[in-house]
Amino acid sequence: MKNLSLAVLTIALSTSVFSASATTISAQSQKYGVDGVEVIVGDNQYASGSHAGAIGDPGIGLQPIFFGTRISFASFKARATENEHGVYELAASTSAHSANTGKFNFTQVANAEVYFGDWSKTGIDGDATHTAFYSGKDVSESLPNSGQVEYTIAGINQFDSSGKLSGTFNADFDTKEYTGSLSGHELNITMSGDILEQEQYQFNGTAIANESIEGHSYGNFFGADATEVAGIVSFGSEHIKDVAFGGSKAQ
């Protein structure tokens, strides 16, 4: 897949949002501040008080709280509840944060400062504000020149279940192409595309949900030897199906 279709490129430009600092790469499937989307990911901006974290680390913010000032994911995780599936949950009804901030489900790639998950304003299935995101530190500055690598990945979509979608991501550094799949309770997704080392997204291509719904897949590699991966699959106006995913090289 050396040339992405015009439809895929249009989806990519109109719906995905990319953010990069010296240390952190982030993306989300819907634009902050548009159509009720109040979540924003990027580098941490807050280094004092109870939400302190290292400036530049992976961070997350909400428009109702200090106009979207981002706090570190490490701090955010400490205020969430980890469920039996290893997913951190934070909802407006909890006492850990102010009301009317929506529902979060997110998790962390093992042994890495790479986070992925989703948010919606109400947490009710069908909420069009649903936004998938990832934010990671130590993006891979160079990728392997050859070889095939399999990653064990998990996905997050709060409307699919409170757990994780399971799957694999296969990078062929010889042909500079990738394939992948994610399986959940209601969502079954395949993806494929090109590995583009010098682009903002180091992999970029297509996705198909439930054998018929066309979408976009994109993301980045992390670690000194591309040991981790994180990305998003998004489906145009059907944002309730958007999934964030991440994982590590299979053992």
Give the positions of each predicted feature.
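Mature soluble binding/inhibitory domains
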Residues: 21-251
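Gram-negative bacterial Sec-dependent N-terminal signal peptides
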Residues: 1-24
